[in-house]
A protein has these predicted regions:
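A detector for small-residue-rich transmembrane helices and their helix-helix packing motifs
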Residues: 1-200
Length: 200
């Protein structure tokens, strides 16, 4: 089976995220929590009490400032390009959104457990899902896909988690949740294309 040569969805997601950010920057201040809640950021009381479940999706497309946006878009471009090219656009999108929503649900569960009422937004949960999916893909392809190696992906996972847990204001529950959701979704969707060759 030929792998897809197109990475249209990765490019589209980057354009959409950047477009939404610059539109909101024109309308107000994306670094203001109240403003971001108005436009779809995740806030536990509005989901638990007002059943505004759409926020589990809308918050994936929102970012608190240009640095937050650019960091996520660089990672989305690098990881998405490799993953979408390998598994195809449909499975890529499925992993992206399952990971993003799953990450937000796990973040909400942690908020409920800790009583934290933080406003959260960003594509990082979905992007960690791509990282988890790529980890499974390289495992299935005997340690390498394109220029990516299993060691490289594992190092990226550990480094990303380290920076998350040693920084403030980071939704680590969403990151870990996205990573797990992406890995498990990839296990279900991707069965590998490389098999050991038999000598004749």
């Amino acid at each position: 089976m030929q792998k897809s040569k197109q990475t249209v969805c990765t490019a589209a997601l980057i354009v959409i995220n950047m477009g939404i950010f610059f539109l909101l920057s024109f309308l107000g201040n994306p670094e203001n929590a109240v403003f971001m809640i108005k436009y779809g950021a995740m806030y536990p009381p509005l989901i638990f009490e007002d059943t505004q479940y759409y926020r589990l999706i809308t918050c994936i497309f929102l970012h608190f400032g240009i640095d937050h946006l650019m960091n996520n878009m660089v990672m989305l471009g690098a990881l998405g390009w490799n993953l979408e090219k390998e598994i195809g656009s449909f499975k890529f999108l499925l992993i992206y959104f399952v990971s993003g929503i799953g990450a937000n649900l796990i973040s909400l569960a942690m908020d409920f457990y800790t009583g934290n009422l933080a406003v959260s937004a960003g594509a990082s949960g979905a992007i960690f899902g791509l990282l988890g999916a790529l980890l499974w893909v390289v495992i299935r392809n005997r340690g390498k896909v394109g220029r990516l190696t299993g060691r490289g992906i594992l190092f990226m996972v550990l480094l990303s988690l380290y920076f998350g847990f040693t920084s403030t204001g980071v939704d680590n529950a969403a990151h870990v949740g996205g990573l797990i959701c992406g890995f498990l979704t990839a296990v279900l969707l991707y069965h590998g294309r490389n098999v050991p060759r038999q000598e004749v």
